[in-house]
Amino acid sequence: MLDQKDNLLSSYNYDLPNELIAQSPTKSRHDAKLMIVKDGLDDSLNLVHAKVWDIKDILKPADLLVVNNTRVVKARLKIRLSGGGAGELLLMEPRGDGRWLCLGRPARRMRGGDQLWLDMSRDNSLILKVIDKDERTGGRIIQFSNEFTSWTEMENILDLCGEVPLPPYIDKDKSSDHEESYQTRFASKPGAIAAPTAGLHLSDELIENLKTRGIKIAQITLHVGLGTFRPLEKEDLSQLHLHSEWIEVTEETIKAITNCKEDGGKVFAVGTTSVRALEAAYLSGRGALKPYEGKVDLVIKPGFKFSVIDGLLTNFHLPKSSLLLLVSALIGRKRMLKLYKQAISNKYRFFSYGDAMLITPESVI
């Protein structure tokens, strides 16, 4: 049962020591710690400490993992500003005719009509133009050449000039080769500006081991953007709206889910993005899971009724984030906070390169 605090953003806050923010992945992807949340009520922890590798012994042959196959693009571009000085663009999404929604820094120096320069080489620069401010996101609409209408067409520029857009809490000077470590093994469809981080734990060895044991893996696409990682600001969560993100749920994935449930298996989402894609597709089908392609802005918070997924593999998320709301919708806010307190006591590593939590079907409220 919900209480009044479930609808207040401040109720999803917790204190985290800086040393528990993971700056790099574990040596092997599957070596991360795994907190297994078992059955229990809101006032019961009932958990097991393990490793991600151990998930192969927890899942059953009829079970299904659903992963996000989005690929992180090198969407961070260093630019020169009109009037001198350096700036930065983070490409968010194409808007047609060579126009892109971007987050710009310093935004105050990117006004409508301003020119920007992207240096392709010492003697070759691409001239960009600021069209306008995007009022909903606070970003800027930037005009590139007309041929740059999609991530695929932008690929050569990004490979030449772009950088992997790491979260601000990761010190890129201290960490590993992010072009490899910040991609999942399923990353095939470019369009994300942040990794679906739960999928980072699935190594080639673990994937093969799971398949050998008869555990199936299906894929969805959700291009991770502002809707996933932008900090929430409004205290009243009844007014919460998320920026839309593009998803695709295919007929093949729906068949895999249907077969899993018919065989008595459980559907485990790998990451909160997989949850949002599947549940959004179900809602778009008006009570039936159907193929879906398009933008979604689904908010999942306590009180949400899950219709597709049975369990979740997920990382430990930032305080007061939409991801924390989703986890709380599965296991309850009070229990979530107690589990996070246990994770901190046991020196779990948090956020993108951090450790993982497995929410089992019997623990879902």
From Swiss-Prot:
Protein origin, superkingdom: Bacteria
GO cellular-component term (any): cytoplasm
Organism, scientific name: Prochlorococcus marinus (strain NATL2A)
HAMAP family referenced in this protein's UniProt entry, alphabetically: QueA
Protein's name according to its UniProt entry: S-adenosylmethionine:tRNA ribosyltransferase-isomerase
Alphabetically ordered keywords of this record: Cytoplasm, Queuosine biosynthesis, S-adenosyl-L-methionine, Transferase
Catalytic activity: 7-aminomethyl-7-carbaguanosine(34) in tRNA + S-adenosyl-L-methionine = epoxyqueuosine(34) in tRNA + adenine + L-methionine + 2 H(+)
UniProt subunit comment: Monomer.
GO biological process, one term: queuosine biosynthetic process
Metabolic or biological pathway, per its Swiss-Prot or TrEMBL entry: tRNA modification; tRNA-queuosine biosynthesis
